[in-house]
Amino acid sequence: MQPWSSVPVPKVPGTARPLRLFDTAAGEVRPVTAGRTARMYVCGITPYDATHLGHAATYLAFDLVHRIWLDNGHDVHYVQNVTDIDDPLLERANRDNEDWVVLAMRETALFREDMEALRVVPPTDFIGAVESIPEIEEAVGKLLASGAAYRVDDDEYPDVYFRHSATGRFGYESNYDEATMLDLSAERGGDPDRKGKEHPLDALLWRMARDGEPSWESELGPGRPGWHLECSVIALNRLGMGFDVQGGGSDLAFPHHEFSAAHAEALAGDHPFARHYCHAGMIGLDGEKMSKSKGNLVFVSRLRGDRVDPMAIRLALLDGHYRSDRSWTADALTKGSARLARWREAVALEAGPSAEPVVERLRDRLSDDLDTERALLAVDAWVDEALCRRGGDAEAPAAIRDAVDGLLGVQL
């Protein structure tokens, strides 16, 4: 798959700050100690409802990580997948009497357009699950051979499952107890009640072909891959073990990221899969959970269709800590639009207060676990002074414009 078009990132003068992020596995904010090439994997969309604001908020958070690494002089190898074969996609296609391939292609194209409009720096590798099936088949074979996987006792559908206990470390990423894991597995695409499994938590690796479902010929038998293993294989084969950041929404901490790590660690015989597990909060609507079942998803494309400036959307989503569950409201968008207008007015002036202390504060805030709320306030303070015609630095408006673009991704 091809990602969206590249987004220019201005170089910001001054001294960058090393990044610190909350690590779900450690339960604390820790330094992210990347090498010359920083490596990140962020779980992508299942392309049937793209791009809602929950998606957007997650990818904006990890876009900031990308930008901070660039500011620190790192090369960045960023991998993002597309889950272009999975039960929710097939269910939507069946509901709408649409070919699942056509649906996935259309929604993936829409996602690319939305990401480009929001000025998200594209991944180095943008990889679909379908194109990765040969790699996934090979991985399932290795897990079976090592004893980390088994076939269920089912003559009709002898699906392949992963022994969750295979690495001896299962649970280290999410830190949930078994009862919580079982509840979340049932809620989030698992099948704890599947007959023939050795343990309710064991996860699907290869689903044998069923009537009416797409499948691929394989030495494993005709079928299709399980969700968690797709990300394990795509990340492992492109980034290797011990990459810097595994990212996604907080609903992916378990079971998805826990199993992705366990699968990869069983395959590699090494630990850890990622050195930082980082999760973004959920976005609600007017105080309620935003979900497909409630029918209250807000889509970036529809806002753009209503002529909302994508930079106002970006500012509205950045006005809150990325790890917090937040609510999208009309007031939030109004505030983002007003802020954007004031910032653009200020950087269009011939002069303003010195930009240097503002850029320092921006870097300080963003490097401290992506504290975007206080980063925006730092720019607001400069804008207030500039619009009051205080300060005579003729280079300041352009410097602020470039810093806001380079570090926050907001084009003024």
Curated annotation (Swiss-Prot):
Its EC number is 6.3.1.13. Its cofactor is Zn(2+). GO terms for biological process: cysteinyl-tRNA aminoacylation; mycothiol biosynthetic process. CDD domains: CysRS_core. Keywords: ATP-binding, Ligase, Metal-binding, Nucleotide-binding, Zinc. Pfam families: tRNA-synt_1e. Signal peptide: none annotated. It comes from the Bacteria. One of its GO terms (cellular component) is cytosol. A motif ('HIGH' region) lies at residues 45-55. The keyword ATP-binding applies. L-cysteinyl-5'-AMP binds at residues 43-46, 58, 81-83, 227, 249-251, 283. Zn(2+) binds at residues 43, 231, 256. Monomer. NCBIfam families: mycothiol_MshC. Belongs to the class-I aminoacyl-tRNA synthetase family. MshC subfamily. This is L-cysteine:1D-myo-inositol 2-amino-2-deoxy-alpha-D-glucopyranoside ligase. It comes from Saccharopolyspora erythraea (strain ATCC 11635 / DSM 40517 / JCM 4748 / NBRC 13426 / NCIMB 8594 / NRRL 2338). The gene is mshC.
